[in-house]
Amino acid sequence: MRSLLAKILTAFVAIAALGVVAPTPAQAADTAYFEMTDITRERFIVKLTNPAKIQHARDLLNGDTTDRPHVIGRILKRQADYNPQWSYHLNGDTVDFFDVAIEVCDATIPYIEDHLDEAGGAFLPGLVWCGWSTRLVREVTA
């Protein structure tokens, strides 16, 4: 009887502890924001909405992986509230990571800003941007 009571009490304490230890807001959210840079050292915020991609970004920042360190995604030609310095942002649903990509989608953060009216034609066809020198710097709050 004493053994059964000890097991029940242990299980109760374990369940109660799970309720007390909650994930941090950055870890619990379905959306995460990351600051990235490129060869120009300008800063740009990327919104991620896919849990696997959020984890990959965190793994890159923690040094747990070096695979696919560069950012690729489809540009939206409008400002985002989390990225007010720029007249464009990446569609969070299209953001991914890569090792190597074709040259036609490569550009720097400020070059896109300066040539945004040309994006989607011969410059960044399909509005796909794959900055070869992009890298994440840190996770940020929105």
Regions found by a protein language model. Name each.
Residues 27-142:
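Function-determining sites in protein domains
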Residues 1-28:
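Secretory targeting and sorting signals
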